[in-house]
Design a protein with these regions (language model features):
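Cytosolic nucleotide-utilizing catalytic cores of signal-transduction proteins
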Residues: 1-105
Length: 105
């Protein structure tokens, strides 16, 4: 069942919507991480995967305030607010796209 959302996304590959999602968030965060040797994408992935910010901070081995700072930086870069449900869904799609492309699904 875990593969189903990826299957749906795979059918959207190379569409304008797919590329928009990539350019709006994924490409910007990858460029920021490359340029500043940071780990915003990893932090975002952990925050989306865990049940709480505390768990996400623990998984990343960072303080909760550092996690909040990074989520703020993600918002600054992408204009997507982790704490807003529709934006969080958009961010989740980006992480799924990243995983798909990284694993060549």
């Amino acid at each position: 069942e875990e593969w189903l959302p990826f299957s749906l996304l795979m059918h959207c590959r190379n569409t304008s919507e797919y590329n928009f999602i990539k350019m709006t968030v994924l490409d910007k965060l990858q460029e920021y991480d490359r340029r500043y040797q940071s780990s915003l994408l990893d932090t975002l992935s952990a925050a989306l995967r865990e049940n709480s910010l505390e768990d996400a901070a623990e998984r990343q081995h960072i303080h909760i305030n550092t996690l909040r700072y990074r989520l703020g930086k993600i918002k600054e870069i992408t204009q997507k607010n982790y704490f807003k449900m529709t934006d969080r869904y958009f961010l989740l799609l980006c992480i799924m796209i990243q995983r798909m492309e990284h694993e060549q699904l």
